[in-house]
Amino acid sequence: MPQKTSQNSLRNVALTASKAYRTKEGITVPEWDGAKVTLREPSGDAWVKFREIVNPQLAEGEEAPTLTEAEKFLRNKAADVVLFIDVLLDENGERVFSDEDQEQVSKIYGPVHSRLLAQALNLGMSQEEAGKP
């Protein structure tokens, strides 16, 4: 039977930043000399930035430009980097990168980063968990 939480205790837990997201701790990254990282699901702010990159706002009557495959790849990579720098945490639960690191991370972003991002995205709530059809 779950332990009953006092109202004050519940409030404190609900206001704890480290408990605002699902996390996956102790992930070993062999390609990074066996470094251990923590991943969390992306924040709402990161999702907004992601969507702004993938679907930039157009002026009224303006059509979205047709992108080449290379342009689509670069756009999608830039959007993924925004999420990646948001979800990668060190063993203490602190972000490894700041938003200012986006350009630097984008230059080296590869399959290892992409696999870690995929794990973080899987922490998000499924439609079944949200009770949606």
PLM region spans:
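Short, surface-exposed, charged amphipathic helix/loop patches that serve as local interaction elements
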Residues: 2-5, 32-133
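Short acidic-hydrophobic surface loop/beta-edge motif
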Residues: 23-33
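Extended acidic low-complexity intrinsically disordered regions
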Residues: 1-24
